Amino acid sequence: AVQMAQTARQQGGHPQIKSLAASIITDQQAEIAQMTPIAQKLGVKPDAVPLGGQMSGGMMSDAQALGISMSQMGMSMNMSSLGTARPFDRAFIDMMIPHHQGAVRMAHAELAKGTNPQLRALARRIVTAQDREIGAMNQWRARWYGATSPAGGMPQG
């Protein structure tokens, strides 16, 4: 998400996209900062998505253990294609919504199966924030391009 948002801050055509991108970067960095010490305390090595946008082996096994596929995680896209996509804002929305949907699915899985109170609170915040962002992106896409994202809206937990 951070890589896509950094590209959107530079190439976004609508001010709403640039503003959302800045917010995503700030939120993601805060979430990573919050999760890292929790993971260390639990003895878990945090995995990151490399710049190419492919999930690491550890992230894949974590998602699969929760019953979530890579396409459900929004990680099956080729993020390197975003920089050359036209219209850029539509491509950004069409890539970010599935990514957000994947984060929401992971957050719902944490709420269903997790026991760490800090992670459960973070999961609730992720669901709330990303629901709002998915709704906004679909409204913008419908207004600017005549239809909402093919990915749909908020996944249900």
Residue ranges of predicted features:
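His/Met- and acidic-residue-enriched segments that coordinate or traffic transition-metal cofactors
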Residues: 1-157
